[in-house]
């Protein structure tokens, strides 16, 4: 599959929309994750209420795939708890590795199915989810 098939219009639209881009005033959890192989960097911040995401912001320095994945998170993560985000993260890996269709109620994840077979790009999509999980762990009470 060519780069033009991976970076299709839906990916470009999600990356451009940048849903959730910004910073929170007083986040409960924050994580910064880098991919040294490609230079992508994601900073994710969360606020929680009763164990569920009540606020979320991200800053991404990365490729279209990384920015699009962060935008999907910005669009869908509100109201989710850590276990739900973990399931979505596993689903993302299955979409990339096994070309399984999205089933979590996050239909936008299907836009990443053309990335299947391009292993060097998997982490670009997964990085925002890793950052969100790390931010949720940082927000969890000790």
Predicted regions and their residues:
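C-terminal binding/interaction regions
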Residues: 1-20, 80-142
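Structured beta-strand/loop patches that form or line metal/cofactor-binding pockets in enzymes
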Residues: 14-60
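Functionally engaged cysteine thiol sites
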Residues: 38, 63, 124
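Short, thiol/selenol-centered motifs that function as redox-active sites or metal-ligating centers
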Residues: 60-69
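Alpha-helical support elements that line or immediately flank enzyme active sites
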Residues: 69-81
């Amino acid at each position: 599959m060519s780069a033009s098939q991976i970076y299709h219009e839906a990916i470009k639209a999600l990356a451009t929309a940048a849903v959730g881009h910004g910073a929170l005033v007083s986040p409960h959890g924050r994580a910064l994750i880098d991919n040294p192989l490609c230079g992508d960097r994601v900073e994710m911040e969360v606020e929680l209420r009763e164990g569920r995401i009540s606020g979320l912001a991200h800053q991404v320095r990365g490729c279209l795939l990384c920015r699009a994945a962060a935008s999907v998170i910005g669009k869908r993560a509100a109201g989710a708890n850590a276990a739900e985000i973990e399931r979505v993260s596993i689903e993302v890996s299955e979409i990339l590795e096994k070309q399984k269709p999205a089933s979590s109620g996050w239909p936008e994840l299907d836009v990443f199915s053309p990335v299947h077979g391009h292993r060097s790009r998997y982490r670009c999509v997964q990085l925002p989810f890793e950052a969100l999980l790390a931010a949720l762990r940082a927000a969890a009470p000790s």
